[in-house]
Amino acid sequence: KSDSNKFPIISEIWLNPLSFLKKAAFSRSFCLVPFPGSRYPNFMIERILLGAPTFLIAVPQLVDPNFFRSVVLLVEHSDEGSMGIVVNRPIELEIGEFCASQDMTFNGDATQPIFQGGPVQTDRAFILHESEQEGPETETVMGNIRLSYSLESLSMLVEEPPEHLKVFLGYAGWGEGQLAEEVTTGAWLVAPADVQLIFQSNPDDVWELALHQMGIDPLQLMHSGSVH
């Protein structure tokens, strides 16, 4: 008798990987665990799992200092490449100080931190905010969550800041096929984006909370070698 009946999920991965990935994409969360001889190629990951908006959750073995224990909101993904914002990496710069350096006044809690959004274009500001405001260089990410990427947009938002607003310097970028390769090699877990985690008041908790939402104990992931 075939052992596939004992392990129906593993059997489905091997016998019908496309069907399995489609089901996974619509589940509450999904953890892609690669293994030798995997039959799901990168194009399946590209088309089914990596549609924005999505959370990319770094595994503990990802030791790149730009992404160690990071949670990335994937905001754009196409055949040409991908763009994301690291949502849980505050830096020692307050939003009031940053706005003052740009000749603006922040009319909200000026002590909240600026965040490092990624290693690309770190001199450029990106603003995630929950509002109905349609401003210049602003795109809808999900629901009322919008991403603005110009100082003109920021100048409009700081006058009457919405309850949920975070400012990031830089973004995370991947070239053609690069992100899918990193996912299949086990550097990232993939999960649906969660608005509450994006604007979580304590960014130090975001990584563990994101894993717990997937039903994963972080300690269970800490027993293998590093991923670069």
Regions found by a protein language model. Give the residues of each.
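Positively charged N-terminal leader segments that act as targeting/secretion signals
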Residues: 20-29
